[in-house]
Structure formats: C-alpha cells, structure tokens
Amino acid sequence: MAKTKISEYSATPASNTDISNINIAEGCSPANVNNAIRSVMAQLKDQQDGTSGDPFTVAGTLTSSGTLAVTGALTLD
C-alpha cells in the first residue's frame, strides 16, 4: 500500500519501505531518496494544515495561552 499520509507509516522502521509509492528500501536509487524526502515534507505540511484527513491526537496535558479557534467538532473527556 502506498503510504500517502503520516498515519499510514508503521512504528516498525523496517516496514516503511516506500513513501507515496517511492521505493526507499535498501539499495534504492539515490534519486528516490530525494523524491521521498520531498514527499514526506508535503505530507507533514498537509497534516499541519489539516488537509490530510488524519486526526491529530494529543495525549497528556496540553497547556495553551491565547486564543483557541476550533472549526468542526471538538471532543473533551
């Protein structure tokens, strides 16, 4: 499966052999490394912007000062 967003990566490093269908397995083309890094950077930006469809969960304590603007649903336990 092509890993096209951050939530699709595995916590097991050896399982992450592609990024957006770009081969990053051992022995891959050096050009693939450049393309994969660019793809990860775009995926991180999509997650930051909220356009990837990935939920973002914060565990523990979140302290904020200032204004909190929420668009959509907000669940507090």
Which residues fall in each region the model found?
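N-terminal alpha-helical targeting/anchoring segments
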Residues: S20-N23, A31
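Intrinsic disorder/low-complexity segments
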Residues: I24-G27, T75
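Intrinsic disorder/low-complexity signature
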Residues: P13-S15, A31, L74
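Short, intrinsically disordered N-terminal pre-domain segments
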Residues: M1-S20
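Intrinsic low-complexity, repeat-rich intrinsically disordered segments enriched
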Residues: T4-K5, V40, Q47-D77
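Long amphipathic alpha-helical coiled-coil
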Residues: G27-Q48
